[in-house]
Amino acid sequence: MAGASSVSVLFSGGLDSALLAHLLRKLPAFEGGRGMELATIGLAGSADLAQAASAAEALGLKFNARTITPEQVRAAARSVEETERSQTAHGQLVPPPPQGMRLEVLTGLRLALEGAPTTRVLCGQGADELFLGYAHFLPLRGERLERRYREDLSQLQGTDWPATQRIAAALAKDLRAPYLDPELVQKLSTFPLESRRRGGVPKGLLREVAASLGLPTELAQRRKKALQYGSGIHSVLSRA
């Protein structure tokens, strides 16, 4: 974020976003949290609001919590669908309209971006794919693991991240995903997949790196639900 005077981090209180916030505050431009905004969304009483509050306290940073309503969730989902339809209308090659889990995730990202008070925004997209954070990776080994990893990364880079960028553009946000930096992705390609889940722990390598960089242990080892579950969005859209 060279040249940025202020930036928001989409902050759920989990490992991925906590590490971004921790590293950002070490940069001279954002020393001690100056110019940083931690943007959190969730329905009233949701796990993400509580976890973000405790993580921000552990980091010594302030955060902005946006308590969303079921009506706002449904409206955001319609906006996501409209953004994708508009691409089709303009002759762009895009996937079918998002449904199910994909719609829930994109809806959560749209709501989080709406709540980010700055134009420049960082998010933790890519960490679960690159560091094997998803539960579906757990039983996989060898070629099956390699195949699923390649499928997930291809889906993210070719479909989900471009869709997220379209949402950000519609909201006039400059959204960056540090975990998807090409140099980092290339560097990680030299690490065997099994080494990324040290001891069989999802994102084990990332947890070790985070701890070595000074992230509080409670955050480096924290497990949390995915955005759509921790925020309560799944419970709303699954009934829609």
Describe these PLM feature segments:
Residues 112-117:
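Active-site nucleotide-sugar/metal-binding loop of Leloir-type enzymes
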Residues 6-59:
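ATP-dependent adenylation/pyrophosphate-handling site
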